[in-house]
């Protein structure tokens, strides 16, 4: 306690010499922090008698108050000086000639999303939205992917807790829409989805569009013609399209869709996978309270960045997210 006044004086001198906010904060920690030299004086109270402690405690608090007041005053001065310096540096010379504005443009992913939505809108599809933070039921269970199902491993899911996650696809929007209404349905569900993956063709966040049609007397032939027509209109040319048998828990039968994209070195057709599709599984209808004996449906899903890469000739998916103006200006 006998050197308290000296500590206060040292602190005030240090505050006065501080010429920037970082140095001032270091002084605050040194003198008033949890292990600060003035704060530590409180430990000496235990050595004093009960009669001496109140007065000693008051002195320590007054000492802390003095230094704290000086720090606050110095901080205000430094912040004011910083603002004045910045304003002086940013002063405008009104005699300089004017500069034209550099107009922006839509991001290529936004352009692609809008193009997809416009194509399906002409076919009578509505655009439905849903939450990006989903529950396990709508993201997996209601899509015929129970907890023990190995297909869950394909999704590389970001979990908040065992029952809450970032959606891995936009299919939950279809479930929520079917739960809230009655068939027939004709919808697309665009939006951001999340999976723990990152390389030249994958990012942890990307965009999907998933479509659903539920009506009476729907067949795989209807699905096939819808997909083929969409791809023809999107790429603005006739394409050879191939449907390969595949597996998705929420559709049966299921298929992967490939398009002809150039030629292999041996002259054979080079096929590129662009989307997945299938007939809605009866179990999914059961979860949504729809009679699968009366109604049938088909679903499809596609990656927006994937189609944007093909349409614009982009080789690396990550370029869409790097905010490089040299890249983005090409799409205005």
From Swiss-Prot:
Cofactor: Mg(2+)
InterPro entries, A to Z: aa-tRNA-synth_II (IPR006195), aa-tRNA-synth_II/BPL/LPL (IPR045864), Phe-tRNA-synth_IIc_asu (IPR004529), Phe-tRNA_ligase_II_N (IPR004188), Phe_tRNA_ligase_alpha1_bac (IPR022911), Phenylalanyl-tRNA_Synthase (IPR002319), tRNA-bd_arm (IPR010978)
GO CC annotations on file: cytoplasm
Residue ranges the record marks as coiled coil: none
Co-factor binding details: Binds 2 magnesium ions per tetramer.
Binding sites annotated in the UniProt record for Mg(2+): 252
Subcellular location, record wording: Cytoplasm
Keywords: Aminoacyl-tRNA synthetase, ATP-binding, Cytoplasm, Ligase, Magnesium, Metal-binding, Nucleotide-binding, Protein biosynthesis
Keyword match Ligase: yes
Pfam families, per the entry: Phe_tRNA-synt_N, tRNA-synt_2d
Protein EC: 6.1.1.20
Molecular function via GO: ATP binding; magnesium ion binding; phenylalanine-tRNA ligase activity; tRNA binding
Domain of life: Bacteria
CDD domains: PheRS_alpha_core
Family according to the record: Belongs to the class-II aminoacyl-tRNA synthetase family. Phe-tRNA synthetase alpha subunit type 1 subfamily.
Name of the molecule in the record: Phenylalanine--tRNA ligase alpha subunit
Source species of the chain: Marinobacter nauticus (strain ATCC 700491 / DSM 11845 / VT8)
